[in-house]
């Protein structure tokens, strides 16, 4: 079982690293230059991520496997962690742009990519309904908080109206709102439209990983080393330690507890890099957080899964 848990963690993140490595190769071979990387990244932000947000919500029936107690706990814990992260980062970092990237890197996990593989590998694909429903609840909150955070910490002192306008015009927010409207109004798109949105949504994560690899510069790590260590410690150790301890004390077990592992112990969300770069935050720090948190999460997620399994909690 020890080896099985390690394999689960590695298999969940290995494809991400392979695609990022392809991005590094593409850039090194000169197939794409720095300006093209930025243009493609903007296309991902404006076209692919909104399609992904819409597709994550469109056609979903939230009531089938909805666990109100788990949802309330996860949302409440996320709110508490977000507030604590903001307070902490404001104390340890003075740069506005770095603040936004750090807050996002610590609170915002890669739940979409990590959640399904982890639960499926431990409990089987027949037990994915609860996790899938939680994705439709937690991921939009992740994204709204990210837009709010990066808009506020763009630099200077923006007016509240400017911040609100930036949030409302954000492509990911627009995609999420359209998805929620489609669910609320029971709108059924024609098959060709569903297929088109689905294709764009499916391209979002691999393209983001490819461009992340293409934009990665090992020399930039030295500049962001201090903040990178802070973010990795928060994302992979502090946040899961607090959230999972509270989850165990609250009585969550089995699929519900492993879903909390996926929410709070996963590495930093891939889309945080694209958003940071496109919203004038510290893109180098955000990219480094995605890469290194994904790397170290093979060990830390294995540790959390093994510890919970050893205590017979699932």
Description of each model-found segment:
Residues 1-314:
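Alpha-helical transmembrane segments of multi-pass small-molecule/ion transporters
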């Amino acid at each position: 079982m020890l080896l099985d848990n390690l394999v689960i963690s590695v298999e969940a993140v290995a494809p991400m690293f392979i695609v990022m490595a392809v991005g590094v190769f593409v850039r090194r071979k000169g197939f794409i230059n720095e300006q093209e990387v930025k243009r493609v990244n903007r296309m991902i932000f404006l076209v692919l991520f909104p399609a992904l947000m819409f597709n994550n919500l469109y056609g979903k029936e939230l009531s089938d496997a909805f666990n109100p107690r788990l949802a309330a706990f996860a949302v409440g814990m996320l709110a508490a962690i977000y507030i604590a992260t903001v307070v902490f980062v404001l104390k340890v970092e003075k740069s506005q742009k770095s603040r936004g990237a750090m807050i996002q890197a610590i609170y915002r996990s890669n739940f979409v990519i990590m959640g399904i593989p982890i639960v499926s590998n431990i409990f089987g694909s027949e037990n994915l309904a609860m996790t899938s429903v939680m994705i439709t609840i937690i991921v939009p909150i992740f994204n709204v908080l990210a837009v709010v955070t990066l808009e506020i910490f763009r630099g200077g002192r923006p007016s509240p109206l400017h911040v609100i306008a930036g949030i409302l015009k954000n492509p990911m927010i627009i995609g999420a709102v359209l998805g929620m409207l489609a669910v609320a109004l029971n709108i059924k798109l024609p098959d060709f439209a569903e297929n088109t949105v689905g294709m764009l949504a499916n391209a979002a994560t691999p393209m983001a990983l490819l461009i992340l690899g293409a934009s990665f510069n090992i020399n930039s790590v030295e500049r962001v080393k201090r903040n990178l260590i802070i973010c990795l410690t928060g994302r992979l150790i502090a946040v899961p330690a607090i959230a999972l301890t509270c989850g165990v004390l609250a009585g969550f077990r089995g699929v519900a507890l492993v879903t909390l592992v996926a929410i709070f112990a996963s590495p930093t969300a891939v889309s945080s890099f694209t958003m940071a770069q496109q919203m004038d935050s510290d893109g180098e720090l955000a990219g480094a957080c995605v890469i290194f948190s994904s790397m170290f999460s093979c060990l830390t997620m294995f540790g959390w899964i093994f510890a919970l399994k050893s205590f017979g909690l699932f």
